[in-house]
């Protein structure tokens, strides 16, 4: 099920939705004292770096703390990949999957408040997300390949109602997991 088993040369990221990555830190997660092998057998695998030759590097769990900065890591790795591929002069495909703005949003402490008074950590993290996207776009420009590059930016689904007013489904009806426009408008 790894992307590298389906045509990708390299993959760096997590294989689960973010809420699954948080589960081992929740108070009702099965305790290792009661279920010694539960986390190893059923828990999330964390952040993997995999390669088409079958190598798999486990870079560690995607904890709530790591979620604050994982997108910085993904942006840096994306930039390095762009530089490497552009220098080789070969066409390439890069699929960069940032974790923000997925619910739950974990904001790094130094970013709290950057959106200004009356704003939330969600807004602070949106600024960080914008910086990460900008970093990747700047790398394309710096590599001199912008005129021969297609960039497609999207999200996987609409917002959750419980993230209102930040979710921005208004004025559309519905939310994630419904058949209405608010679920699909991205």
Language-model features: locations:
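Histidine-centered active-site microenvironments of extracellular/periplasmic hydrolases
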Residues: 2-6, 98, 103-109, 114-122, ...
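Sec-exported extracytoplasmic/periplasmic mature domains
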Residues: 13, 83-87, 134, 138-145
């Amino acid at each position: 099920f790894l992307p590298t088993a389906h045509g990708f040369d390299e993959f760096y990221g997590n294989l689960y939705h973010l809420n699954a990555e948080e589960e081992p830190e929740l108070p009702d997660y099965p305790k290792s004292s009661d279920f010694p092998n539960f986390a190893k057998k059923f828990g999330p695998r964390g952040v993997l770096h995999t390669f088409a030759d079958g190598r798999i590097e486990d870079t560690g769990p995607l904890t709530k703390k790591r979620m604050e900065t994982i997108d910085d890591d993904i942006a840096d790795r994306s930039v390095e990949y762009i530089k490497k591929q552009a220098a080789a002069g070969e066409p390439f495909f890069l699929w960069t999957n940032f974790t923000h703005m997925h619910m739950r949003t974990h904001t790094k402490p130094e970013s709290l408040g950057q959106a200004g008074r009356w704003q939330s950590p969600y807004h602070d993290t949106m600024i960080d997300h914008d910086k990460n996207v900008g970093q990747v776009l700047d790398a394309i420009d710096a590599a001199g390949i912008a005129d021969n590059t297609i960039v497609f930016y999207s999200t996987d689904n609409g917002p959750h109602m419980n993230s209102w007013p930040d979710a921005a489904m208004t004025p559309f009806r519905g939310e994630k997991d419904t058949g209405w426009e608010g679920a699909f408008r991205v």
